[in-house]
């Protein structure tokens, strides 16, 4: 898929709105995700829960695995690169992935610089905990933003925090007078033009998805109620007892997040959810959301 201008990239991301993007590690899982109604899949060697459990350096997945997943499904395929690792991004662009996630779930390759995403035809999604982070990533060329949450924990609390923080800061920007915007742009380290856009429109200039710790249909619906455009689900599906049923349930929960009766129906008899991690048990260095700036 030939992609280039920022307008085309962000338009492509708009097509995912109201949908669920699922982490998959095999072509078989990708087919389950597609049949369940996922709008795209994220091709990985290990889901975040395994990356967290196994430790070591987490890198871009083997291109062979990604190509096998691309061959198995007709929906768009995304893949992750390390923060700042533009050569991994060049490789993914060369094999034809539809979207690249510059992800804090992998071990950062550069602690000072994110990738210059303008140099790529393929669009990027990046994580953000607050408005400043989101606008910096957009200034670097990101066509889509997601909450960072705390991936691989099955605990939605950080994703909720990041979503609420983003909207709180957007509302604050809207409350400012025009002559106060420059000082605020300096304070949060974001370009004035983007801060002004947020002030005028009351939202981010790109699609904003929820990600990190979403494990149940109720979690997914909660994030939609908090104003997210859609949901990434990582470990929550294929680390659960009945992945096929849970995948379908989460897709339906996102589509019908305003209907408690549907939510009750899809939440029934899903088998065991992923075990999950209480964030109080995480050491500071194990918190993935703090990676990047």
From Swiss-Prot:
Transmembrane region(s): none
Database matches in CDD domains: pdxS
Any GO BP annotation: pyridoxal phosphate biosynthetic process
InterPro entries: Aldolase_TIM, PdxS/SNZ, PdxS/SNZ_N, RibuloseP-bd_barrel
Enzyme Commission (EC) number: 4.3.3.6
Pathway assignment: Cofactor biosynthesis; pyridoxal 5'-phosphate biosynthesis
A GO MF label: pyridoxal 5'-phosphate synthase (glutamine hydrolysing) activity
Binding site for D-glyceraldehyde 3-phosphate: 164
Disulfide bonds: none
Catalysed reaction equations from the record: aldehydo-D-ribose 5-phosphate + D-glyceraldehyde 3-phosphate + L-glutamine = pyridoxal 5'-phosphate + L-glutamate + phosphate + 3 H2O + H(+)
Keywords: Lyase, Pyridoxal phosphate, Schiff base
Active site: 80 (schiff-base intermediate with d-ribose 5-phosphate)
Gene3D superfamilies in the record: Aldolase class I
Residues annotated as binding D-ribose 5-phosphate: 23, 152, 213, 234-235
Function, in words: Catalyzes the formation of pyridoxal 5'-phosphate from ribose 5-phosphate (RBP), glyceraldehyde 3-phosphate (G3P) and ammonia. The ammonia is provided by the PdxT subunit. Can also use ribulose 5-phosphate and dihydroxyacetone phosphate as substrates, resulting from enzyme-catalyzed isomerization of RBP and G3P, respectively.
Family: Belongs to the PdxS/SNZ family.
Oligomer status and interactors: In the presence of PdxT, forms a dodecamer of heterodimers.
HAMAP family reported for this sequence: PdxS (MF_01824)
Protein name: Pyridoxal 5'-phosphate synthase subunit PdxS
Annotated organism of origin: Thermus thermophilus (strain ATCC BAA-163 / DSM 7039 / HB27)
Highest classification ranks of the organism: Bacteria, Thermotogati, Deinococcota, Deinococci, Thermales
Annotated gene: pdxS
């Amino acid at each position: 898929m030939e992609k280039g201008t920022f307008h085309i990239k962000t338009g492509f991301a708009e097509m995912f709105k109201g949908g669920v993007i699922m982490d998959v590690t095999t072509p078989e899982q990708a087919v389950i995700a597609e049949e369940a109604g996922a709008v795209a899949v994220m091709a990985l060697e290990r889901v975040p829960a395994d990356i967290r459990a196994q430790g070591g350096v987490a890198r871009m997945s083997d291109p062979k695995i990604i190509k096998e997943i691309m061959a198995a499904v007709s929906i768009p395929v995304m893949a992750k690169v390390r923060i700042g690792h533009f050569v991994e991004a060049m490789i993914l662009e060369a094999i034809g992935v539809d979207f690249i996630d510059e992800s804090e779930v992998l071990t950062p390759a550069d602690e000072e610089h994110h990738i210059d995403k303008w140099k790529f035809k393929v669009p990027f999604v990046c994580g953000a905990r607050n408005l400043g982070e989101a606008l910096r990533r957009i200034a670097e060329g990101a066509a889509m933003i997601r909450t960072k949450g705390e991936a691989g924990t099955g605990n939605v609390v950080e994703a909720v925090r990041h979503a609420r923080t983003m909207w709180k800061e957007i509302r604050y920007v809207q409350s400012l007078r025009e002559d106060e915007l420059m000082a605020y742009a300096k304070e949060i380290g974001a370009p004035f033009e983007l801060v002004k856009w947020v002030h005028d429109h009351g939202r981010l200039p790109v699609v904003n998805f929820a990600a990190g710790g979403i494990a149940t249909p109720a979690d997914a619906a909660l994030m939609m109620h908090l104003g997210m455009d859609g949901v990434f689900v990582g470990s929550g599906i294929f680390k659960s007892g009945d992945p096929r049923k849970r995948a379908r349930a989460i897709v339906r929960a996102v589509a019908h997040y305003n209907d408690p009766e549907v939510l009750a129906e899809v939440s029934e008899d899903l088998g065991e959810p992923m075990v999950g991690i209480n964030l109080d048990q995480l050491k500071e260095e194990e918190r993935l959301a703090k990676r990047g700036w």
